[in-house]
Amino acid sequence: MEVAFDIRNFSVYYGNKVGIRNVNLEIYRNKVTAIIGPSGCGKSTLLRSLNRLIELVDGVRIEGEVIFDGKNIYDDGVDAVELRRRIGMVFQHPNPFPKSIFDNVAYGPRVHGIKDKERLKEIVEESLKKAALWDEVKDRLSDSALGLSGGQQQRLCIARAIATNPEVILFDEPTSALDPIAAAKIEELMVELKKNYTVVVVTHNIQQAARISDYVAFFWMGELVEYGKTAKVFEKPEKELTEKYLTGRVG
């Protein structure tokens, strides 16, 4: 299997506080990898390290390497803006721009230099289709994105991430603000997206991780406790702490 990210001896510190410590992990291409663990265990810290968003936090210090496409993304000379084009992100709360549905999706391609109107139309349609939203919005692309439901807004944010033609899409608790029906649509979509993208998702929802992921990483107090194929980790975890967390006895 091809490796998307090779994370080596990777640590993140917020001042004197440990975010994550000495993480070694391979994340595979065209798979869904779930990162689970209790609040404050380092899940989102790791996720935001994969496209260098973590650097935007004041006082953060980073050690170790994240190898993506043969290079350490933290090396001097790596263009963080281009990296974030290749590694898209969808956040916990839908955050559409106060613009039209069309302009939300076209925003990234325009920033990256695509000006041709026909090409932009193609990208918008293709991205909305991949985000399973096209049929619901195709007749109102000029309407404000803020008029969409929460679930539709989240799928719009996924379309916006897709529009820059990334290789990886990171999801940070993407369904926690949604009702169960909208959440189920996002879950289906994440599984579908792995055909074309590498998907990494942080989730508090253990059942969600079991349903959608191929691989699962369990974090506890900033450390990676266990990582492996989801079926194996859930059915026969190697570590007692993993088993206790999955059965609700700690966490």
From Swiss-Prot:
Catalytic activity: phosphate(out) + ATP + H2O = ADP + 2 phosphate(in) + H(+)
Protein name (database record): Phosphate import ATP-binding protein PstB
Protein EC: 7.3.2.1
Bilayer topology term: Peripheral membrane protein
Assembly, per entry: The complex is composed of two ATP-binding proteins (PstB), two transmembrane proteins (PstC and PstA) and a solute-binding protein (PstS).
Function: Part of the ABC transporter complex PstSACB involved in phosphate import. Responsible for energy coupling to the transport system.
Family per similarity comment: Belongs to the ABC transporter superfamily. Phosphate importer (TC 3.A.1.7) family.
Name of the top EC class for this enzyme: translocase
Pfam families cross-referenced by the UniProt entry: ABC_tran (PF00005)
CDD domains for the chain: ABC_PstB_phosphate_transporter
One of the record's GO cellular component terms: plasma membrane
Gene Ontology molecular function terms on file: ATP binding; ATP hydrolysis activity; ATPase-coupled phosphate ion transmembrane transporter activity
Binding locations of ATP: 37-44
Classification via PANTHER family: ABC TRANSPORTER I FAMILY MEMBER 17 (PTHR43423:SF1)
SMART domains according to UniProt: AAA (SM00382)
Location(s) in or outside the cell: Cell membrane
UniProt keywords, alphabetically: ATP-binding, Cell membrane, Membrane, Nucleotide-binding, Phosphate transport, Translocase, Transport
Record-level GO BP terms: phosphate ion transmembrane transport
Domain ABC transporter: 5-246
